[in-house]
Amino acid sequence: MPRGKQSGISYGQRTKQKGQSDLAQLISLKRYLKDRFHMNFKREWYVGFDKEYGYLCRISESVGRKELQRFKWKNPDLICCDKQYGVIIVELDGAIHDRKVAKTEARNELFRGGGIKLVVLNIADIKECNETIIERLECEMLRIVGTPCKTL
């Protein structure tokens, strides 16, 4: 893989990942979002934040060596830069996020503090509510686009 293109897996997550890969689910969610909301989400792109103030500075498919130290980088599951609704990030949280709550909350705070509309899909919470991931995603996206969600 070329040096400039460093995806989450090739950039060090491969050795850390113990649970099931969410790749198939992310591809399915990306396709659903494109079909339903006509938004083009990118999978595993990088989001760079100012280290001191936390505001959003850069969104990039890859990160070069010089940029690595310049910004605080995050690698969200799905990201979209929409003309009408701004930057939207979708995070699919599995069991690891239930154990690393403080880190997950810090991530969410960083995204929201940077003016990003964040959709967090916690798999355990969704199952507990007897919903599907798509149903929860639909509801959260409808909130972002300004259409109320019909709840049971």
Task: Locate predicted features.
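Nucleic-acid endo/exonuclease domains
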Residues: 1-152
